């Protein structure tokens, strides 16, 4: 902690903000200190921590002081962390929260997630070392005399340790990749066999394709629909997470919406998405928050809330006039229909069928008969006949 210096938190000339994350706690080695909940900012030149309650409490450490970084997975009751190993503090360091520290590393605990994306961006900055190619004002430089080079400060033991960490990380990534590939090959083999069976039955016209086989076939396709689901661990718990989730939802919902006439209830969407995400289940609250951003991001699907409070997802090209005209035509052909009867005819849920009929009634094309036998809709003859 003695490497940190007090700062205003303002970016210097030629310094660029890379990423920021709320809810980050700073540890001095393994020790908890008073810097509990703050916003961690990564720029091209510094790591900046600002207290969320007291914005005047702001400290920073130059990226040039970092030797290497490593991830620490979350545990039971423990948040995921990034461990930052540091060079020794220069003798002429500017004032900071600590004058001395026995630890050569700090830990950054991410209480609101987002550590995966932050670690990736920090690793990129450490590799690119843009603070060397794009100098900033002298106020950022914590040294006035010559600073030891990176290799000299680390030492042979430090270099060997860093190489060993990289080797372990590479081995882990390779093992996970082969494990995922094996699972994919097993699932792909089953899917190919099933698809051949269905194709042969259709081609030879011998027997009908059973509903169970169709469901199995679609489930394999759906389970492989989201290769890399958006998670809080990757994007944190704020607006960025819901924006990325909204973009992914638009991608996976467009085809199912087209199959279902351009509209689905939010309940159907919730089941469909969580089935595709596998173990990375989505909460109803996150789904609603992401869907609220669909239209603002100009995506091909949008959230719609009916007067009754029912929420649906529909295609941007889905036209209300065509939907009402279709409902009027169907009811006119049958003379009158209940929501259940209309749902069976058009092949949609009773909930959506009722909302479509109510919308047609609201626009004056249908009228209702609400009796002990239930709610029944009729064509509004006052609108269709002179």
From Swiss-Prot:
GO terms for molecular function: phosphatidylinositol-3-phosphate binding; ubiquitin binding. It is found in: Cytoplasm; Endosome; Late endosome; Membrane. SUPFAM superfamilies: PH domain-like (SSF50729), Winged helix' DNA-binding domain (SSF46785). One of its GO terms (cellular component) is endosome. GO terms for biological process: protein transport to vacuole involved in ubiquitin-dependent protein catabolic process via the multivesicular body sorting pathway. Residues 105-138 form the GLUE C-terminal domain. Keywords: Coiled coil, Cytoplasm, Endosome, Lipid-binding, Membrane, Nucleus, Protein transport, Transcription, Transcription regulation, Transport. InterPro entries: GLUE_dom, PH-like_dom_sf, Snf8/Vps36, Vps36, WH-like_DNA-bd_sf, WH_DNA-bd_sf. Residues 1-88 form the GLUE N-terminal domain. It holds the Pfam family EAP30. PROSITE patterns: GLUE. Component of the ESCRT-II complex (endosomal sorting complex required for transport II), which is required for multivesicular body (MVB) formation and sorting of endosomal cargo proteins into MVBs. The MVB pathway mediates delivery of transmembrane proteins into the lumen of the lysosome for degradation. The ESCRT-II complex is probably involved in the recruitment of the ESCRT-III complex. Its ability to bind ubiquitin probably plays a role in endosomal sorting of ubiquitinated cargo proteins by ESCRT complexes. Belongs to the VPS36 family. Component of a complex at least composed of ELL, SNF8/EAP30, VPS25/EAP20 and VPS36/EAP45. Component of the endosomal sorting complex required for transport II (ESCRT-II), composed of SNF8, VPS36 and two copies of VPS25. Interacts with VPS25, SNF8, TSG101 and CHMP6. Interacts (via GLUE domain) with ubiquitin. Interacts with RILPL1 (via the C-terminal domain); which recruits ESCRT-II to the endosome membranes. Interacts with ECPAS. This is Vacuolar protein-sorting-associated protein 36. It comes from Rattus norvegicus. The lineage of its organism: Eukaryota, Metazoa, Chordata, Craniata, Vertebrata.
């Amino acid at each position: 902690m003695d490497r940190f210096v007090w700062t205003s938190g303002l970016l210097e000339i030629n310094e660029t903000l890379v990423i920021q994350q709320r809810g980050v706690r700073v540890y001095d080695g393994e020790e908890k200190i008073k810097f509990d909940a703050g916003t961690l900012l990564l720029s091209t030149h510094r790591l900046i921590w600002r207290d969320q309650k007291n914005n005047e409490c702001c400290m920073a450490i130059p990226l040039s002081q970092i030797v290497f970084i490593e991830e620490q997975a979350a545990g039971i009751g423990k948040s995921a962390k990034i461990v930052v190993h540091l060079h020794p503090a220069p003798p002429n360091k500017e004032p900071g929260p600590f004058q001395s520290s026995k630890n050569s590393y700090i830990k950054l605990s991410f209480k609101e997630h987002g550590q995966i994306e932050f670690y990736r961006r920090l690793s990129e900055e450490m590799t690119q070392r843009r603070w060397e190619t794009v100098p900033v004002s002298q106020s950022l430089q914590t040294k006035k005399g010559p600073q030891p080079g990176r290799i000299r400060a680390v030492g042979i033991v430090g270099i060997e340790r860093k190489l060993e960490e990289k080797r372990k990380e590479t081995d882990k990534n390779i093992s996970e990749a082969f494990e995922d590939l094996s699972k994919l090959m097993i699932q792909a083999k089953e899917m190919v066999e099933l698809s051949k069976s269905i194709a042969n039955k259709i081609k030879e016209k011998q027997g009908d394709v059973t509903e169970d086989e169709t469901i199995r076939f679609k489930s394999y396709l759906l389970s492989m629909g989201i290769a890399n689901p958006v998670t809080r661990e990757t994007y944190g718990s704020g607006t960025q997470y819901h924006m990325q989730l909204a973009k992914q939802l638009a991608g996976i919902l467009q085809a199912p919406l087209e199959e279902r006439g351009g509209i689905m209830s939010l309940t159907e969407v919730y089941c469909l998405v969580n089935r595709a995400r596998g173990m990375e289940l989505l909460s109803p609250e996150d789904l609603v928050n992401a869907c609220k951003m669909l239209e603002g991001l100009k995506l091909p699907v949008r959230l719609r809330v009916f007067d009754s409070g029912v929420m649906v997802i529909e295609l941007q090209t889905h036209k209300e006039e065509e939907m009402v005209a279709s409902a009027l035509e169907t009811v006119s052909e049958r003379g009158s229909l209940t929501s259940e009867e209309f749902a069976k005819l058009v092949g949609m849920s009773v909930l959506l069928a009722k909302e479509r009929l109510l919308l047609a009634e609201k626009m004056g094309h249908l009228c209702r008969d609400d009796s002990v036998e239930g709610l029944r809709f009729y064509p509004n003859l006052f609108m269709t006949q002179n």
